[in-house]
Regions:
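Short functional hotspots at interaction and active-site rims
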Residues: 1-173
């Protein structure tokens, strides 16, 4: 139903979720020649760039980020900022059932967002395959970033900035 309303241009449809990037590369396996040893340096702890993104089917993406864990307060602040951006049609934000999306501070804002034609729609439990922004996060982690991008924190941040900017998705506040 929501896709039909979007297709008929009655609404703007956004898929939203968070992801985290740190200095541990996402290497599911590694090949090596016989009798040679591959070394992958493990890092413990360290910094993490947490992002909350809202991606439309029209190709628009807004990303909010911070280096401390994402909580309900951050989701609320991000959605409040997003609700102030001009939009000619009602917006529907599709979210999964993560605890931060159901935080009381988020629920307290629902009426305010509804007054500016922004509604939240929660996906069924255990259905990340229905949240299209998950594909973007997967491409970032497994396709666009490679081993050299994880050498330092500044290199990883710079690379993420390039990845999102080159896709037309600069990092926001």
């Amino acid at each position: 139903m929501l896709l039909t309303l979007w297709f008929l241009r009655y609404i703007d449809l956004y898929f939203a979720d968070e992801a985290g990037f740190n200095l541990n590369p996402y290497v599911p396996y590694a090949w090596q020649k016989a009798k040679q040893t591959q070394r992958i340096l493990a890092r413990k702890g360290g910094k993490r760039l947490n992002v909350f993104g809202l991606m439309s089917l029209a190709g628009h993406l807004t990303i909010y980020h911070r280096e401390i864990p994402i909580d309900g307060e951050f989701i609320k602040a991000s959605l409040c900022d997003f609700s102030t951006k001009p939009c000619a049609k009602p917006r529907v934000i599709i979210l999964d059932n993560g605890p931060v999306h159901h935080a009381q501070v988020v629920k307290d804002e629902l009426a305010n967002w509804e007054s500016v034609d922004m509604l939240l729609f929660y996906l069924p439990t255990y259905s990340p395959h229905l949240n299209l922004i998950e594909i973007l996060w997967r491409f970032c982690k497994y396709k666009w970033l490679n081993k050299v991008n994880y050498k330092s924190w500044s290199k990883l941040r710079a690379c993420l900035r390039i990845v999102f900017s080159s896709s037309g998705y600069p990092l926001q506040h």
